[in-house]
Amino acid sequence: MLSVAIITKNEARNIEDCLRSVAWAQEIVVVDQFSTDGTADMAKRLGARVYQEPWKGFARQKNSAVEKTTGDWILSLDADERIPGPLKQEIEETIVRKDAFHGYFIARKNFFSGQWIRHGGWYPDYCLRLFNKGSGRFEERAVHEKVLLAGPVGYLRNPLEHYTYRSVADYLLRMERYSRLAALEIPEAKRLSLRQALTLRPAFTFLNMYLLRAGFLDGKKGLFLAVSYAYYTFLKYYRFSEKDLASAHPERSEKEEAS
């Protein structure tokens, strides 16, 4: 049995398309952070079992959704993601097949402002999203939460679709907020001088995305993403150097990012 686990906060613009893309699943669980735009009601109408809980952080919120499922297999999705037909078929075939894998990485087709970004490290962007409930759990960390799996992992062939930022303004706003959380997890800064981190890492980020990973092939959007990721890297280390973390209120910043 497959259970889909989703967390939401004011996702009325996304939740219907997301849930319709997984309507074939035996169970859909949504943990909602008291949305004010009708997200919870929409999810209920579309057949999801909805729970409303206060914000606990990305990983804890996702683990809460997983814990409320009853299926043997979990498909963890974000509200701005969709499961196309070919991936649906592959998932259905995979979970009834008796193989050695306890979980599967799924590639993501990331769309930015309506364009599929094929380069710059944005594709295939593998994420472990399908896993056996008894073997996986989200690692509790401030940002970039991922599934920790006790067992071997495989890869699915077909990608899911991820409709990321709606506009340049939306992207910049989220990057500004997200940098506060990312500054919490910079082990490299303990081994690298902050001056080097502030200068070399942003430059490397740009060169890596735009040249080494061929971001230039995505045109103006590829250039924008490389420049903005370099700025995000600078901002992350700058906030760390300014010891801005205490005043950043990371839990509140996470809540804003989830909205």
What are these regions (language model features)?
Residues 21, 32-44, 78:
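A conserved acidic beta->alpha catalytic loop
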Residues 63-66, 72-73, 77, 84-246:
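Catalytic-site signature of metal-activated, phosphate-bearing donor transferases
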Residues 16, 37-46, 86-87:
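Acidic helix N-cap motif at the loop->helix transition within catalytic regions
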Residues 1-3:
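Cell-envelope/extracellular polymer assembly enzymes that use nucleotide-activated donors
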Residues 247-259:
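Intrinsic disorder/low-complexity segments
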Residues 24, 46-47, 126, 149:
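Short, structured coil segments at secondary-structure junctions
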Residues 40-68:
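Conserved donor nucleotide-binding strand/loop of the catalytic core
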Residues 6-24:
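Short, well-formed alpha-helical segments that are part of the catalytic scaffolds
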